[in-house]
Amino acid sequence: MKTLGVLFIAAWFIACTHSFPGAHDEDSKEERKNVDTVLVLPSIERDQMMAATFDFPSLSFEDSDEGSNWNWNTLLRPNFLDGWYQTLQSAISAHMKKVREQMAGILSRIPEQGVVNWNKIPEGANTTSTTKIIDGHVVTINETTYTDGSDDYSTLIRVRVIDVRPQNETILTTVSSEADSDVTTLPTLIGKNETSTQSSRSVESVEDFDNEIPKNQGDVLTA
């Protein structure tokens, strides 16, 4: 340990002695006057690096397109993925731009009044009526189709009304004084006759028979 201490002190003295300026001769001064002065300026990145070592570090992780300034962010985060990220970002931006152009082209072909003109019902109409008997009911299907338009766009409105009625029915119409008609539908039965028969025994005889205790029934007790 003593040897190391002595060596350290000796090295320190040598360094201090070497750091002090020495005496300059007059000849050396004259030679230096004849030599042209060359000014060497440090690069911008070196200045930024030296300034960043003494300034407060920037903790922002946002990417800037102005320039690649050196800061603590570039020191802590490697830049080997920046090229891949910029390529992916540019590809996504180009794809979104293409989609916007396609949507703008599609929307530009739609007329100002819209695809369907709701203020006007098409004049041309095709009406069909179909009647079927299903499970004892008469089913009538009335379908009306309105079509209008051109080769670019067209309007189609289809109205279907389904009417279901019993197969056998009677319609009675009553017209009131106010010219309003009320329709009353009463179902009728065809081919069925209801007949009532009177029982040969009266109610009193049936009740007496129900309350009578049979003589033949009884409990048999055996010892």
From Swiss-Prot:
GO terms for cellular component: extracellular region. The keyword Secreted applies. Expressed by the venom duct. It is found in: Secreted. Disulfide bonds: none annotated. Its main location: secreted. The keyword Glycoprotein applies. Residues 1-19 form the signal peptide. Residues 186-203 have a biased composition (Polar residues). Keywords: Allergen, Glycoprotein, Secreted, Signal. Residues 186-223 are annotated as: Disordered. Glycans are attached at residues 126, 142, 168, 193. This is Icarapin. It comes from Apis mellifera carnica (Carniolan honeybee).
